[in-house]
C-alpha cells in the first residue's frame, strides 16, 4: 500500500456471536514469551500474532502490545460490520482475570537474530524475517507479524504471501510498524494495512477476479475498481478503517459467488451464524501397525455437536491427508521413526485436540527417546511349511517367523479353522484328520498375529 504512494504488497508465490468484542483496556498477558502459548482458547484455524524487532533494535513490546490488541479488536468489529456471518479467528490464551476477548490475545515477542540492516530491504528483508522467525510453523495457524524496525522504503507498509489454504511458515504476513503508515491502536492506517495483508494471506486477489490492477498500479494481486476497497494497492494517507470496504461490489475476492477462490470460504474465518460453537472431541486413542513398510494408522470416531466430522492426518507435523474415514495408510522406510497425529474437523472448521503417537516402522509405538512402549508390529510370515506321514500320523513342521519382539506361539489352522496353538514349530495329527489346507501364523509376545505365509494342501 503506498501513501500517496504508501504500498501494501502481496508477495505472490472464539468469537461466539455476531456482536463485536469490546476494545480492551489492557493486555492481560502475565509474561513475555517468544513462542506460542498453550493451550489455545480458540478451537480452529486461527491467526497468531507476533511482535518482532531486530537484534540491535529497541524493544517496544511493552508500549505497543496494547495498541496492537486494540487494532485487532477494531478489525474484528469492522469485519463483522462488513459481513455479519464471518470474522477472523485470532489466537487467544486464557490469561487469568481478563474481561475482554482481545485482552486475551496471544502475542509472542521475538528478538530476531540479525541486525536491522538484514531486514530493512522490502523483498530480501521480508524473506529474512520469515527465515529468522523460526518455530512459527503450525500448519493450522497463519501468522501476523508486527515488525518494529527501520525499512529502506518507508512507503511500503506490509507484505504477505497469498496462500488461501496454507498455514505455518508459508503463511506469514508482516506489517512494518515504522513505515509511514500511522495510527497504531487507533484503527487508522496500520489497521488498514493489517487487514489488507490478512486478506492477501487468506488468498486474495484470486486468479479470475474481474478487476485486477494493471502492473503499474500494483499488479493483479489487487483490485482497482475503487479506492474504498481495503485491498486497493495504495492510500492517500490518513485513512481510517471505517472508511474502507471489504471487496467493493463483492465481485473480486469476497462473497462474490463466482468461480474464483472466495475468501469468505476460508477456514480461518469463524462462521458466526452457525449454532455449532464447540469443537469436535479428540480421538480417544491412536493405534498404528506395520507390515514391512506398509503402515496403518487407525482411531475411534470423534464426536461433535454439529454432526459429521473429517480428520486431518499429520506426519511429522505436516498435514498429509484429510479424510472421513477413521484410518490412514502410509508407506515408510523400515526402521524409520515417524510421528503421526490426528485432529477432528467439524463442518464450520473448528478443530479438536490433536492426538499424536510416535512409531518406529518394524518395531512399534515408541516414546520421545525411541524406547518401545507397545509392540504393534506383526511377526513376519511362516516359511517352508512341510508335512511327513508316518503310519497313521502326519507331522507338520515349519520354519521360524521373524519378529523383533520374539515369537510367543504359532496358530495352526485347517481349512481356515484354528486347530492348535503351540510354542513349538511342529505339530502331529492323526492322518484321518489331515486332509485339507493347512496354514500357520506366528503370534508375538504382544499378541500381534503374524502375516499369512505359505499354506499346504494335504489329500
PLM regions and their residue ranges:
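Beta-strand-rich modules
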Residues: 330-350, 431-449
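Propeptide-to-catalytic entry region of secreted or membrane-anchored zinc metalloproteases
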Residues: 21-142, 147-154, 273-275
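Pro/Thr/Ser/Gly-rich low-complexity, intrinsically disordered linker/stalk tracts
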Residues: 275-306, 350-404, 448-459
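A recurrent domain-boundary module in secreted/ectodomain proteins
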Residues: 244-281, 363-373
